[in-house]
Regions:
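Short, solvent-exposed aromatic-acidic interface loops
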Residues: 7-10, 78-85, 136-140
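Zymogen propeptides
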Residues: 1-59
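Solvent-exposed loop/turn segments at secondary-structure junctions
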Residues: 35-39, 83, 119, 138-141, ...
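Structural recognition of the beta-strand scaffold that forms the well-ordered cores
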Residues: 28-32, 65-67, 75-76, 124, ...
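Short, solvent-exposed coil/turn segments at beta-strand boundaries
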Residues: 1, 25-26, 68-73, 128-129
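Domain-core and long-helix interface of multi-subunit machines
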Residues: 94-98, 102-159
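Active-site-adjacent helix-turn-beta-strand microarchitecture at beta-sheet edges
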Residues: 36-113
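Extracytoplasmic
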Residues: 24-26, 61-63, 96, 118-120
Length: 170
């Protein structure tokens, strides 16, 4: 099951480590998902923000939104929808970063950053509620590029994959 959490349980709350967020939400593993902004001095998710069926940031959807439906399906909704539209469609969580790596089983490449190697965090869906999480860092390793991630997700049979916030967050 894929679940989400806000930093310390609040939108724009104090910064919280991933391990603390996992522990306080009864999780087993955790990763950072969405890009965030420190404009208020506290981390707030950028763009559309639905967490556990509650709408926090009601922005229009864009190409960079990943949605998780109540039935466990992960997808990127059409551009230009509002949060109320996603809630009505059964969306329980959204994430903002991107790009989409695989959609309907097909690679969604290339992009400007396709060939660059960075620390990465990404999620793939084999089928609803059957996910693959991918996290790399660059301690003694150059990281992954988008093609590498697509190939890894395809090897697990993912029909959808999405690049989450990586870099220092990974």
């Amino acid at each position: 099951q894929l679940r989400s959490a806000l930093s310390n349980g609040t939108y724009g709350g104090e910064r919280q480590t991933t391990s603390s967020a996992v522990s306080s939400n009864g999780g087993i593993i955790g990763v950072n998902g969405s890009a965030f902004d420190y404009g208020t001095g506290k981390p707030s998710p950028l763009g559309m923000c639905i967490k556990n069926g509650i709408l926090y940031g009601d922005y229009m959807t864009s190409y960079s939104v990943m949605a998780v439906k109540n039935n466990g399906t992960i997808y990127t909704p059409a551009q230009g929808l509002m949060g109320k539209d996603l809630l009505a469609a059964g969306v329980k969580d959204t994430y903002n970063f991107g790009p989409i790596l695989i959609k309907d089983g097909a690679a969604q490449l290339p992009w400007a950053e396709t060939e660059k190697y960075y620390p990465r965090t990404a999620v793939g869906m084999v089928k609803p509620n059957d996910y693959v999480l991918l996290v790399t860092d660059t301690g003694n390793y150059s990281g992954l590029n988008h093609w590498d991630m697509v190939n890894i997700f395809k090897s697990y049979g993912c029909t959808y994959a999405y690049n989450l916030d990586g870099g220092g967050s990974s």
